[in-house]
Amino acid sequence: MTVRVAVAGASGYAGGEVVRLLLGHPAESWVALTAFSQAGQAVGHPHLGPVAGRVFEPISAQAPLAGHDVVFLALPPAQSAALAEEAGARVVDRNMGADFRLRDAGVWERFYGSPWRGCWPYGLPESPGAREALAGARRIAVPGCYPTAVTLALFPAVGAGLVDREVVTAVSGTSGAGRALKPHLLGAEVMGSVSPYAVGGTHRHTPEIAQNSTAVTDGEPVSVSFTPLLAPMPRGILATCSARLTPGTDARQVRAVYEKTYADEPFVSLLPEGVWPSTGAVLGSNQVQVQVAVDPAADRLVVVSAIDNLTKGTAGGALQSMNLALGLPETTGLPRTGLAP
C-alpha cells in the first residue's frame, strides 16, 4: 500500500516529528509540506536530511492539501477546524491540534475561547473501544500530550473502580509549547529551573483528562486536579498521578489490573516492580512506560508514566491511529525503543 500524505504545519515541532516518522514508514509517500508563516522558506529541520531541499508550500484546503489520502493538521487551536471545514469530506484528516477532542461545547468555549466545532473519534488506541472506533475513520482527533500520559497512567484503575479524586503533577519539556519564540522559553529563562504554569485547573488539557476518565466510569464524573511543570529539557513528559483508593483495595489488586490491561499493548510497558519510568528511556519512541505503587499510610495509589511528548504524545500517536484507520498493522513505522542514554 502506498499512501499519499500531506502535513499542514510541517514547520513546527509536532509537524516536523510527523515528517521524521513518515520518512521511516514503509507505506508513505507525500507531496505537500505546508506552513503558514514559513511558506516559501526552506524546510527548517536540519535532522530531516531527505527533505532538506524542500520548500514549505502555503497551507490551503484546495491545494496543496487536496488530493491526498491523509492530511495531518499540526496547527494551533481553531486553525485546524477552519481548514477542515473548508476542505469538507474530500480530505481524510488526522488533527493534532485540540479542536475536535472535547465533547462538551461549553467546556471547549470556556478553555479555548472560540466556537465549538464538534468532536471526532478520539485517537488513543489503548483506551476501551478506541480501536473499533478508529478502524476506517476518516477524521481523528489526536489526544493532547498530557492527556495521553495521564490517561494511560490512570484509566485502568479508574475503570476498575479502584480509585477516585485524581491528583496529577506532570513535568514537560519545552517543545510542548511549540516552536514560536516566547520569552519564558529562552535558554536563560529555562535552564537550571523548573517552574509551574496554568495552576489551579486552568490548563487546557484538564477537561480532556477528566473527559477520558469519565469515559471509563459509565458517565460518572471524575474530579481531576492537574498541575503542569516546565522542565529544562527539550522533550518528554513525566506524569506522577495520585488517587485515593477505594476501601479494601490493596497493591496486589492494583498490580493485577494493570498487568491484565497492558499485557498485549505494543506501546505500553508496565515496568517490573521497583523500576520507575524516565523520560530518557522513551525519548524518540512511541513507547509509554508505566509503574504503579500503593501508599498504604495515605490510602492512595501512585502511578508514574513517561512519554516523549512529540512522539507518543503527538506525532507517533497520530501515525498509530492512521495505521488503524487504513487497516495497516498498528505498529507500522513506529519506533518502540528509546534513545537513552
From Swiss-Prot:
Pathway annotation: Amino-acid biosynthesis; L-arginine biosynthesis; N(2)-acetyl-L-ornithine from L-glutamate: step 3/4
GO terms classed as biological process: L-arginine biosynthetic process
Example of a GO MF term: N-acetyl-gamma-glutamyl-phosphate reductase activity
UniProt keyword list: Amino-acid biosynthesis, Arginine biosynthesis, Cytoplasm, NADP, Oxidoreductase
GO CC terms: cytoplasm
Keyword Cytoplasm: yes
Keyword Translocase tagged: no
Record field: catalytic activity: N-acetyl-L-glutamate 5-semialdehyde + phosphate + NADP(+) = N-acetyl-L-glutamyl 5-phosphate + NADPH + H(+)
SUPFAM superfamilies in the record: Glyceraldehyde-3-phosphate dehydrogenase-like, C-terminal domain (SSF55347), NAD(P)-binding Rossmann-fold domains (SSF51735)
Gene3D superfamilies recorded: Dihydrodipicolinate Reductase, domain 2, NAD(P)-binding Rossmann-like Domain
Active site: 145
Family annotation (InterPro entries): AGPR_AS (IPR023013), AGPR_type-1 (IPR000706), NAD(P)-bd_dom_sf (IPR036291), NAGSA_dehydrogenase (IPR050085), Semialdehyde_DH_NAD-bd (IPR000534)
Enzyme class: oxidoreductase
Pfam families: Semialdhyde_dh (PF01118), Semialdhyde_dhC_1 (PF22698)
Subcellular location: Cytoplasm
EC number: 1.2.1.38
Function: Catalyzes the NADPH-dependent reduction of N-acetyl-5-glutamyl phosphate to yield N-acetyl-L-glutamate 5-semialdehyde.
Family under the similarity heading: Belongs to the NAGSA dehydrogenase family. Type 1 subfamily.
Name of the protein described by the UniProt record: N-acetyl-gamma-glutamyl-phosphate reductase
Source organism of the structure: Streptomyces clavuligerus
Gene it is expressed from: argC
